[in-house]
Amino acid sequence: MAIALIFDCGATNLRTIAINEKGQILASHHLANNTKQGIESSDYHIWDIEEIWQKLTSCATQTLNQLMQQGIDLKDIVGISVTTFGVDGAPFDENDQQLYPIISWKCPRTIPVMENLSNQLDIKSLYQRNGIGQYSFNTLFKLHWLKTHKPDVFQKMAKFVFISSMLTQRLTGQFTTDHTMAGTSMMTNLTSGNWDPSILASLGLSNNHFPPMRYAGEKVGKLRTPLAQKWGLNPVPVISCGHDTQFAVFGSGAGLNQPVLSSGTWEILMARTQHAEPRFEFVSQGLTTEFDAQSNCFNPAVQWVGSGVIEWLGKLLFSDVYGSDHYYTTMIKEGEKAFNAGKRAVNFEGIFSQLGQGNISGLSMFATRGEIYVSALQHMANKLKNGLSVLHQVSQFQAKSLICVGGGSKNVLWNQIRANTLNLPIDVVDISESTVLGAAMFTFAGVGIYENVNAAQQAMQPTRKRIYPN
């Protein structure tokens, strides 16, 4: 048996997971993650890398103990990789010392920087080159903030290191840059697949300010001897992974030109394509394009608030069962009754995640809460249809099916409405850890357990349940 040990640094939880070459999770442990208050303002958010590292190493010890309790030989662990949220990182000096804390994606300090971007760069040209939408947490804005507000730090910066690579450096001693993390920064070029010289020049930086790029599946280095001895492991390879989103998509089993919907508080619709055409007219719809986990491929994506709206509605209309074991089943049961009844008058329009931008029409004294609930699900399905149309236009493909993962994929009524609205089959993936599975696929391919990552994906494919339009 071959085992991969995955370190996953999430915004909510820090975890280590041991998974075998068949995609089975053997052991795991997690601890809560949280931001700290910035020094300059109580509104600022930073990540404490020392605390994150201490918690992850503790998780690793617990996970390995679980394996030993099962009688599993720790020498079966053949590789390690790290996944994290995107964009965040920190500056280091020429002596490899961190100069400033990791500014969290939650921090509002970069909002004014984003709002002022048009005074420094051609926004349309920038977007067409790197494909990344204007989000205040983008790495570009963090570096601009450091340059303006911490010029001494910025001047001493010999390299900027993303958080995933800060962790792999502690595992191996080697500084690198995960390609999937670079692709979230707003500083890369979709055509070259590398850093964009003109964007870096606007900061007074060059490629030399970033450690060598590593593609997913490439070797970062070997596990440092002190850690190998501490954990009872061989000095196994540490394999580059990086941004969690890319590995969640790959772990779902998605091939090229296959859209994947991650349905949670936010719904994120992505595809794996060989074509990337960021069109500025779709910026308002949230179109962003990142590097895929595989080289020379891309992940165009659109997003909108999904279950967040449904939960708001549920609390209002189903308050009698909210918080009970019957909450979701009651909503779905009453929704199915309204759905099967056919014609509905209630209609949702607009954006319900913004103040005063959502509208509900067609209400009457005869409308049931089940009908209102179904109409909300239909509204979300319409957003999905519009989002898929955008991906079709910018990536030159026509979807034949849709993969659905995440908490919202467990709602059978919602899935049926999605299938009917798209007139496409929906494949619901039966896995809660698609990010970990995707990272393990690249890890096993990187150490030679599988010939390549496509073979790993095929062998470790999660099970699916297909729902057809009716």
UniProtKB/Swiss-Prot annotation:
Instruction: Using the UniProt record, name the top-level EC class of this enzyme in a single word.
Output: transferase
User: Which positions carry the signal peptide feature in this UniProt record?
Assistant: none
GO CC term (a single one): cytosol
Which pathway does this polypeptide act in? Carbohydrate degradation; L-fucose degradation; L-lactaldehyde and glycerone phosphate from L-fucose: step 2/3
Q: Which residues cross the membrane?
A: none
Does Transcription appear among the keywords? no
Q: Which GO terms describe its biological process?
A: L-fucose catabolic process; rhamnose catabolic process
Enzyme Commission code: 2.7.1.51
Q: Which reaction does it catalyse?
A: L-fuculose + ATP = L-fuculose 1-phosphate + ADP + H(+)
Top-level taxon in the UniProt lineage:
Bacteria
Q: Which SUPFAM superfamilies match?
A: Actin-like ATPase domain
Q: What role is this protein assigned?
A: Catalyzes the phosphorylation of L-fuculose.
What is this protein's name?
Answer: L-fuculokinase
Q: What species was this sequence derived from?
A: Haemophilus influenzae (strain ATCC 51907 / DSM 11121 / KW20 / Rd)
